[in-house]
Amino acid sequence: MSARKGYLLPSPNYPTTMSCSESPAANSFLVDSLISSGRGEAGGGGGGAGGGGGGGYYAHGGVYLPPAADLPYGLQSCGLFPTLGGKRNEAASPGSGGGGGGLGPGAHGYGPSPIDLWLDAPRSCRMEPPDGPPPPPQQQPPPPPQPPQPAPQATSCSFAQNIKEESSYCLYDSADKCPKVSATAAELAPFPRGPPPDGCALGTSSGVPVPGYFRLSQAYGTAKGYGSGGGGAQQLGAGPFPAQPPGRGFDLPPALASGSADAARKERALDSPPPPTLACGSGGGSQGDEEAHASSSAAEELSPAPSESSKASPEKDSLGNSKGENAANWLTAKSGRKKRCPYTKHQTLELEKEFLFNMYLTRERRLEISRSVHLTDRQVKIWFQNRRMKLKKMNRENRIRELTANFNFS
């Protein structure tokens, strides 16, 4: 700074605005000229960095920033204030504050260069009036002190206008954007015959921006009404959309329509009285036994082998199947297999007695047993196979239990 001072102050013939003197008289003269220039005091302590000339004036910080295009960094740190041109609508003045009042040239502690870069002329978004003579300085009282806030003009133009920023979300409480979102949702919905989306009534109180890809279309809600008739559409009444009447719903595909018809037919078959196969006991008549034999054989021909655990508990299995199918027939996809008919108590008892005598049957003995319990040859063979597997499993568990009982794990 000493070299610069010696270069700038060789002679007393320089004007006052070109001096870098550290004397308090020169600085007070500069501060007085800044105060009398019409821009008012800076609001800082002791009439500090005054606002004047052609730069931006920040009322909340008391800082005057000269424009970087007209005032280079080396000159504004020394207090050289040339007359500014009328390129922008900025008043020309004999001096403008580069440092604080009463401070030396080296005390430019507010760091003007990064803020000047932020308010650079090509990057700034201040409105530029048409070229013309600069108006006289405005004579108005200084603005009242207010909390720090960014300049509104510097942030209003921060993005280019051709960037599609507003297409990614929609404030549902604005009336001009709601038809756009509703039309887009109607185009995106795979079933466009549903009711129109009522998206404008969603955010009337909150005003939260909802992304554009999260549009509430009726595709997922109405797809639940496949197996339940009008039940799916009635459940939508609690949501933001009006309930869709069952008659106006979309047409079911032929495969789904046939599947729903089969499900309804099976429900009616379940609600009907049980078949006589379950009712035939040890004291049934000959005619009832023949009907039971025919129905059970037909059911067994169409169904694969039943498991042994379900045969051992026919009452619990029948009750659980009837309740489970009535409760979950509209939740799960049903297979094409018919409902398995478990063996009756009489049939299970006869088969168990024969198994105690002989675990393996010949074909002649198997035919005799099948005639006595009114089952087919294949049913008896499968029952004996399952019973042997069950016995093998029980023997293995008992052996493991005996082995572990010999060890003390205390």
UniProtKB/Swiss-Prot annotation:
GO MF terms held by the record: DNA-binding transcription activator activity, RNA polymerase II-specific; DNA-binding transcription factor activity, RNA polymerase II-specific; histone deacetylase binding; RNA polymerase II cis-regulatory region sequence-specific DNA binding; sequence-specific double-stranded DNA binding
PROSITE patterns: HOMEOBOX_1, HOMEOBOX_2
Compositionally biased region (Gly residues): 95-109, 224-234
Pfam families: Homeodomain
Compositionally biased residues, Low complexity: 235-249, 294-312
SUPFAM superfamilies, A to Z: Homeodomain-like
Domain of life of the organism encoding this protein: Eukaryota
Ranges where the record places region Disordered: 89-158, 221-339
Annotated Pro residues bias: 130-151
UniProt keywords, alphabetically: Developmental protein, DNA-binding, Homeobox, Nucleus, Transcription, Transcription regulation
DNA-binding region: 336-395
Gene Ontology biological-process annotations: anterior/posterior pattern specification; embryonic limb morphogenesis; male gonad development; positive regulation of transcription by RNA polymerase II; prostate gland development; proximal/distal pattern formation; regulation of transcription by RNA polymerase II; response to estrogen
One GO cellular component term noted in the UniProt record for this chain: nucleus
UniProt keyword Metal-binding, yes or no: no
Record-stated family: Belongs to the Abd-B homeobox family.
Function in brief: Sequence-specific transcription factor which is part of a developmental regulatory system that provides cells with specific positional identities on the anterior-posterior axis. Binds to the DNA sequence 5'-AA[AT]TTTTATTAC-3'.
Name of this protein: Homeobox protein Hox-A10
